[in-house]
């Protein structure tokens, strides 16, 4: 009887997953038509909807099980059997790792944290069984010796193009070949020694389409991305070629929106991509291709493995303490853990619910490469012995309502009810202080250029950052400036950008408080110079490229552009890589 019940429950869960994956695939496939028809707003709407689908299907499946099987408590033997049966259902499945994560999500909705171990859920994945099977064909190989280099590349591009033709494929392929020769030294071999491996599907995101592959030669492997854009006049053109793991990693960065990529075998795809970008984790790559829940699962497995192989202690993160969040980190692991405080500083007129809403907004919005993606977790257990006394005291002081303890001695755990995890960066204020101390003017100039660019790209994507103090931005290992303090973000239409009234009397000039009326939502751009850029050397470097950010007129124009549906192009690669900016025969449009 229990075997039959276990099979029925397992089938209910797998059917829920299949519903989810079918809907996910349908909306992913729509990106191709959206790209062809230049429906950029629809692409953003689809991205937001797709992110929500997973939780909706989990809740549906959870409700089905609760109602159909009257589940109120865990039957140990039954649920071990359910997991065993479910594992059998995944033996020949195309997405076993995703289906395991879906199972975990449903189970965790049904039962308490004390049951979250490998007897009942997939703490350890069984998807590694795929490594022993014949790998699915997710890429096509091309050998230029047969048709010549130019014709081979033309064939590659045409095999991926949509119903829209290239505006001048001959010109673009010449630019590709020139760029390969200049930048990819390992491709400078005889044609008979070259081979291209090209993934069989196009990666879509925002206004771009990306072809991804590698060139193999006796000199080694060269990964690459070809960026294709729509000229919005009925033609496609190649905009850039990236030929290094580092530049590709930025395209797949944690501050970018998720790709739309129609692939039935994500396990094989992630393995291929990791071969091209070894510094990217599987968690990074699953998230980048749209499976953010799988990214969370993979991250947590990696984190548990790291805890087992390390012995350093968690500690408070470097930088100025936040008024809303408390942040801690593990020095040997490149992430930070953020919890919402029970009480905020008086100047913060928001609630916990508001803060969670802001983080959700960022998850659903186009992050334009300037807002860090976060992973949200509930009921997370840490070994208490790994927390230093200062951190334990701080957590107990600022967030006692979400902290509890289980077990004793070496087995003691600290359970955090709710937290966010994101990539660790160097706070911009500390980065600049270090550069100033070491008289590294170029680093100061680059960082403040990036700071201004981050603000401009955020507001052009309809995100007002709110608190723009330097401490709320971080610098990545690639040198990019990223915003990561979300509790005051707003849409542009919610803000009133004003010119600060000029003081006309001595009393007004030296007033401790504003002598003019200030309403909620008012923002005075010129105050950036006073509050965020008080150091004269910072302000000087900032003004070289971004003096316009100190004027209300600039912000008002951006606000009007957003209201009119005008969004500036933000490319996930430097302008210097764009073919229109390269020295060889400048491509004009």
Swiss-Prot record:
Protein name according to UniProt: Isocitrate dehydrogenase kinase/phosphatase
Q: What does this protein do?
A: Bifunctional enzyme which can phosphorylate or dephosphorylate isocitrate dehydrogenase (IDH) on a specific serine residue. This is a regulatory mechanism which enables bacteria to bypass the Krebs cycle via the glyoxylate shunt in response to the source of carbon. When bacteria are grown on glucose, IDH is fully active and unphosphorylated, but when grown on acetate or ethanol, the activity of IDH declines drastically concomitant with its phosphorylation.
Kindly list the places in or outside the cell where this protein is found, as annotated in its UniProt entry: Cytoplasm
What GO biological process term is on the record, naming one?
Answer: glyoxylate cycle
Query: GO CC annotation: what is one?
Result: cytoplasm
**Reaction equations catalysed:** L-seryl-[isocitrate dehydrogenase] + ATP = O-phospho-L-seryl-[isocitrate dehydrogenase] + ADP + H(+)
What EC number(s) does its UniProt record assign? Answer: 2.7.11.5, 3.1.3.-
Q: Which GO terms describe its molecular function?
A: [isocitrate dehydrogenase (NADP+)] kinase activity; AMP binding; ATP binding; phosphoprotein phosphatase activity; protein serine/threonine kinase activity
Q: Which family does it belong to?
A: Belongs to the AceK family.
> Matching InterPro entries, A to Z?
AceK_kinase (IPR046855), AceK_regulatory (IPR046854), Isocitrate_DH_AceK (IPR010452)
State a single Pfam family of this protein: AceK_kinase
In the UniProt record, does the keyword Ubl conjugation occur? no
Q: What is its main location?
A: cytoplasm
The active site is formed by 373
